[in-house]
Amino acid sequence: ANQSNSRSHEKSNMVHFFDFNQERLAAWVIEHGMPRHTTDQILDWVYRKGVSDPAQMTNLSRGQRTYLAEHIAFTRGRTVAHQSASDGTQKLLVSWADGAHPTETTGALPIVGQSNVARGQETECVLIPAESRRTACISSQLGCPVGCKFCASGIGGLEGNLTAGQIIEQVFQLGQLKGVDRISHVVFMGMGEPLANYAAVTDAIRTLNAPWGFGISARRITLSTVGLPVAIRKFCDFEIPVTLALSLHAPNDAIKSLENYFIDFIYILFYCFWGTA
């Protein structure tokens, strides 16, 4: 047990690989005495070949592989439960035992502050197969600040924001499941309100879409939101034109406002269709 705790502590002090983008990884590689092209080799192993163990990165020198293993945590999430359905859907319960770094929020909801995922807390992600598609349904927060009555995620309120790396790692872990060749689509429809964790979510989308990352086209990435007007307006200027889905789960505004939603939907819809013009 002591050895396990020691390894966990060591890993928590290492930089998380999925928090790197191409530029930051290149800077880290050069700073640590490796040639620039090592960046492309590492990215190819992780995103093209699905390899997260430096020991298997055979086109790197033995010294480089050892150094990477000692200084970079290629994965931080630990799967504590794995459920499968008869239709091929698979759900992972992932524990972020190493904790998370604070992430900034948009300020669109006053109750959302700078928060972090506490040690040992968990999020869910789901693989949804359909013919040739392999869709990753991922979480952006631990809990949710909105508190829609139809959704269990918000029962305990918001406990923390996930980092960009933790969001990206969910896609990687789902891609490691048996029989999954590659993830073709991503939907932000898991735990949390994505636009309330704007900086981390948009950073994650950049990696999901980038040619050096997962290379998933923008039209295959969907962000679902209850509708945060300030964040929606900002998101309209985001450089990657992903699909924005408004979460509508009631037939009229009275039910939405009074029974389900903490946010006034009429204002949201007006803002979406006229305020962004």
Annotate the PLM regions.
Residues 3-6, 269:
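Short hydrophobic targeting helices and cationic amphipathic motifs
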Residues 5-133:
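Flexible, acidic/Gly-rich N-terminal and inter-domain linker regions that tether
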Residues 54, 179, 256-257:
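Accessory RNA-recognition modules of RNA-modification enzymes
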Residues 121-242, 252-253, 274-276:
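Conserved Radical SAM active-site core
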Residues 155-157, 258-263:
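Short glycine-enriched, charge-decorated loop/helix-capping segments at active-site entrances
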Residues 265-273:
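Hydrophobic alpha-helical signal peptides and transmembrane signal-/tail-anchor segments
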